[in-house]
């Protein structure tokens, strides 16, 4: 079974926020790696794409069996994508955060 995966506006805004954070951090460092923000977003999008085939393998988030979290490793840490399995064919990514952030919003 294949699922259609969509990112909500909030999730897209989270990707923009994470990109901007990494870019600003790298610009302030000696020996900056300006490809890092692009690599991070590519890793996130690649991880999110796995939800097309296996959303039920991700850990549950809260009481609903349809609200789940995808862990996307990157560097020494990674990211967490909160998503909802809406029905038998649709998955919505609701939010994305760095693993070291306390919460989604």
Label each residue range with its predicted role.
Residues 1-68:
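Basic, Lys/Arg-enriched alpha-helical interface segments
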Residues 30-31, 72-105:
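Enriched for short, Lys/Arg-rich terminal
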């Amino acid at each position: 079974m294949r699922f259609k995966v969509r990112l909500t506006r909030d999730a897209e805004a989270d990707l923009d926020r994470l990109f901007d954070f990494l870019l600003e951090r790298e610009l302030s460092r000696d020996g900056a790696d300006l490809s890092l923000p692009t690599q991070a977003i590519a890793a996130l999008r690649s991880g999110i794409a796995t939800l097309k085939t296996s959303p039920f393998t991700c850990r549950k988030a809260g009481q609903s069996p349809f609200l789940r979290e995808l862990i996307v490793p990157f560097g020494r840490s990674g990211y967490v994508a909160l998503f909802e399995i809406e029905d038998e064919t649709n998955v919505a990514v609701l939010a994305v955060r760095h693993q070291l952030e306390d919460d989604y919003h």
